[in-house]
């Protein structure tokens, strides 16, 4: 039977790479994310060309619970619910705590943490009914450790780790697994945007941000690729990972081993 995968924040970066990989494996794909209409159409058509199943896009804003509920209801009506849920949507803002805008805190917590609560809440009932499901939360090395100037992001990602463990325990006997992937620095549009932001905040050059801030903490001195994260997600979405639940897998070039 063809599985249906819902991937939030999947019009670029890690989410798009996961969508491509699951599409190649034959899954129906529900994309989600912002972009100009032409860009969304191009991405949807590209992913559709990789899958033998159905590929569509839902524009739910991850800061709006009603839109998330509408997306999950659409998936239930169209496909009988999500078999695979990948919570990947994420935003970032870098600033000293005393200057951190309240609206940015609220936005980051909403997108990076609360949206996962809402998608999981909608996904679990159909998964329980089927007796099978995979929930994969894209957390971060910042779900395990902290860095300066990222109070909201670090708080949200630590929250994702707690949410992952709690839900995994609640559904442990239902055939549903819940895990987190904790990447280090992956060269995505989100990370690329951080480079000039951190250069401004720290008063250093962009090259220094890359070499002395980002990759300094990764012993391999290399960015993780989106394809590497996607391959791990594919494994966690499969039957071979049925006994992996309530945990995280770090993919951080050795960052959190230090």
Swiss-Prot record:
Q: Which residues bind NAD(+)?
A: 6-30
Q: Which GO terms describe its biological process?
A: lipid metabolic process; monocarboxylic acid metabolic process
The record's keywords, sorted A to Z, are: NAD, Oxidoreductase, Plasmid
Molecular function as annotated in GO: 3-hydroxybutyrate dehydrogenase activity
| Enzyme category, top tier | oxidoreductase
- In which domain of life is the source organism classified? Bacteria
* Catalysed reactions, as listed in the record: (R)-3-hydroxybutanoate + NAD(+) = acetoacetate + NADH + H(+)
- Return the EC number: 1.1.1.30
- CDD domains according to UniProt: HBDH_SDR_c
Residues reported in the UniProt entry to bind substrate: 140
Electron transport as a keyword of this entry, yes or no, is no
User: Catalytic center at which residues?
Assistant: 153
Question: What InterPro entries does the database record attribute to this sequence?
Answer: 3-OHbutyrate_DH, NAD(P)-bd_dom_sf, Sc_DH/Rdtase_CS, SDR, SDR_fam
Q: Where is the signal peptide?
A: none
Family of the protein in this entry: Belongs to the short-chain dehydrogenases/reductases (SDR) family.
Name of this chain's protein: D-beta-hydroxybutyrate dehydrogenase
